Amino acid sequence: MLLVSALLLQSATAFSPVSSHVAHGSALPVHRQPSSLAMSTTPTATTQPTDSSDADLAKEPTNEISPSYDSVVVGGGPAGLLSAIMLAQRDSKQKIAVFDRLPAPPSPTDEKVWQQTDRYYLIGLGHRGQKALDRFGVWDEVKAVSAPVVGRKDWQPGAKAEEGVERLAADKPTTTQVLPRDKLVGVLYKHIMDNYADQVELNYEYQVMPTSFGNDADDDSATDDNDAASAVTLTVSKCSPVDGTSTTPTPEAECEVDTYQTVTTEFLIGADGAARGIANAMEEKDVERRSKQNAFQKLFGGIKPFKVKRFEDDNKRVYKTVPVKVPSDWRFDLNYSARSKGSRITFEALPADDQGTYCALLLMKEDDELAQPNSDPKKLRQFFDEEFLQFGPLVDDETMALVAEKPASNLPAFRYAGPRINEGSATVLLGDAIHTVKPYYGLGANTALEDVSVLADSLEESPTLKDGVYSFSDKRAGEANALVTISRNMDRPGKLFLVTFLLPLILDGIFHKLAPFLFAPNMFALFQKEGMSFRYMQARKRFDRVAQLSILGCVFYGMVVAAKSMVKIIAKKLGQSDGMVGAAMVVGAFLLSLAKKALAGGNESKEQKA
């Protein structure tokens, strides 16, 4: 399995509760009900800065939240923070708040934090992500703490250490830059604190839930043309990390949902990723709305339905992370990849810096003996010695024991939201909240950042916020569907893998080489083309597939007709029936095949003896 860009999930380090924000306005009264706790999880965790120079990333909480904001962003990941930067740049008078359930990110320059390379997601930023970051003036800061990847080096199953094949992406217009996800978040955080601290509040360890999406969304008879007021009402609850979970792949947070503050906003962006708190609330709202509609209203009502399409993971893989320091005579800018015999385990390594520090994934099935927690380190060492000869010497016994001991982590399942990604005229979703894919092809984080750029375009092109919200939904809902559908078709198990991935890859290679003016290159090449939408890729490949199968069908039909004609001619010459001649030709072809195999086997035996 090819991994153009792998996400390397962390086992997050301990972090004491931190909430950092610059307060606007007065503190809200706190609403209290009988105490209860809600558990929430997220695949991101952070580490408290250890150097005093990084204190600006860990300001003491003021616990003061304004009763209203111009805009609220739920989710403090890359897409959420870039959304806040985008909004701040659009209007310097905007009062913006960002809320996230986990602590503030570590400093992007704190080397003590980033030395533990196997504790963090690594993401590869391609042309989509780089273009979005550059548009909002943060790319140079991100690039400064990233490592370039200019190609791959692959080892086929059973290959010796010296038999790796190096492939450089010489014709690739954009060089992929790799860095831990949390480091990217840290860069964006610092950029906000340095440039927009008086405008943007960064509130950590808070959970946000909508109670009203505005009058136009809450009105069950509303249509897209409704111009009713659309302020969104939210409840904000304090959270804290759960003791003992800081070293798990998916750290948890306890949120006091019965002790909350109420906030209103004119514009809500849901960028809370896999948590999907806003998306879940939108889905519940849509179910409630549609339950009150008759059949005619459901079919011809003015509002499109909203649903999160959740696919069953029929090709599930889990992984363990392995820190690796490659030798000084190896290149530090390659993705190193190897597969074991039978494709039992795949080894994928990406650079965590430009000094030869790598973080590797061991991808395997969840029932594999080595995927279990507290597995035998001797068996893991033996597996490396037999299958990954080139990497075994790079992992010492202590690290091998730690890898064997820790539990495996899950890759995300495919999901997308649609056919609209707005609720009323004041709420939109973006990022992983609308499209979740496995990290094999580097599309998740990059597309999430691109969403922010498209949202900026939609707002700039529209006379009102409402028009911008609907424009963004129209542009990106279909993209989310296409992205997830394409990615899932490239990750099917068994025979489906042959039909949906391998065979199309072969056909695209053949036909594009024969007629590049008519047939597009394979999907991997299309991913690298700038300015090409996923919906276009999907439609283009459907056209290619119909044309390819039509041509193959015509060729096959012509071969059958030609064979029948040949049989008739030979039968007429010999005075035999068509069936007799046809059977003789089939038997002859079969015997010729056997003779060819026997001859090849004999030559191989002679070579072995020699």
Predicted regions mapped to residue ranges:
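Active-site-adjacent segment of FAD-dependent monooxygenases/related oxidoreductases
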Residues: 107-193
